């Protein structure tokens, strides 16, 4: 699974038991757990998507600034989403390192930039808006 931050996560079976390996940095671990592990457990135990713990809801946001993507990986940059009369807007403004737990407090969403794609100011992209 090629995502940033979050690499490389491990997902598989060992002796008929599921195994998950999470990255060491807190932001990476949180995103991998929310996007991969929680949905897997929910599907195994028959928990509906509405009842399942998840990262948030997928929305479309207009970028207020350029956002760099990641080569060959889905890129989840932390963003601050605001709701205005014209729609939803997203801004990045803090250090994006995967060890920067503070960024998870001051931001309320992440970009979903496809591999090898940067987000340009004024562009509308998909994002997750945290619950």
Regions found by a protein language model. Name each.
Residues 1-131:
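Flexible glycine/proline-rich
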